[in-house]
């Protein structure tokens, strides 16, 4: 085995230990109130201020049509302007979803306009900071405005559609 492959194997063994951790599995299962959950995606996402289209998902405020519990772990420090994940505040989000329900539009619409920036909050933090959130809340990937590059380990969990 090459040294490079050996390093990758050690890395994936570590991730396997993390994501097969009984406490993490129990947390996700309790959150969804079922044992029929899965990790549907694990990937690294790097963003910078050059060449990225920011007028499309995931850079627009939205909520996911499929419900996930997402884990976003910053692998680099994320300060203001570095593209931290951004959320609508609870009161505004609840009001928005009630309006969509009244119009019976919740299934069709998932991109929303936020004109009042006081109703959103960007999550910043040092590397290792984790944002864990239900995608029923309005959110977006933050736009990188600085010269830094945001690097995030993202893990999406959900109810396994094949078992539910």
Where in the sequence are the language-model features?
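A short hydrophobic beta-strand segment most commonly corresponding to one strand
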Residues: 147-163
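Conserved hydrophobic/aromatic beta-strand scaffold that supports enzyme active sites
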Residues: 60, 70-74, 120-122, 130-132, ...
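Short, conserved beta-strand element in jelly-roll/cupin
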Residues: 64-80, 124-125, 156-158
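Histidine-centered catalytic micro-motifs
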Residues: 58-66, 138-141
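Double-stranded beta-helix
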Residues: 80-138, 162
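Short proline/glycine-enriched turn/loop segments at secondary-structure junctions
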Residues: 142-146
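Non-heme Fe(II)-dependent double-stranded beta-helix
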Residues: 1-61
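Short, structured patches in soluble enzyme cores that scaffold and shape functional sites
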Residues: 46, 73-77, 89
């Amino acid at each position: 085995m090459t040294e490079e492959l050996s390093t990758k194997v050690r890395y994936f063994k570590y991730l396997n230990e993390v994501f097969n951790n009984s406490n993490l599995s129990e947390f996700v299962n309790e959150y969804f109130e079922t044992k029929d959950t899965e990790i549907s995606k694990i990937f690294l996402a790097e963003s910078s201020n050059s060449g990225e289209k920011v007028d499309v998902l995931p850079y627009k405020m939205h909520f996911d049509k499929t419900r996930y519990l997402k884990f976003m772990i910053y692998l680099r420090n994320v300060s203001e302007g570095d593209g931290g994940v951004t959320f609508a505040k609870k009161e505004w989000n609840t009001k928005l979803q009630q309006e969509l329900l009244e119009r019976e539009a919740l299934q069709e619409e998932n991109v929303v306009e936020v004109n009042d920036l006081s109703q959103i909050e960007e999550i910043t933090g040092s590397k290792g900071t984790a944002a864990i959130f239900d995608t029923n809340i309005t959110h977006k990937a933050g736009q990188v405005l600085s010269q830094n590059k945001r690097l995030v380990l993202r893990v999406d969990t959900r109810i396994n559609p094949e078992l539910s």
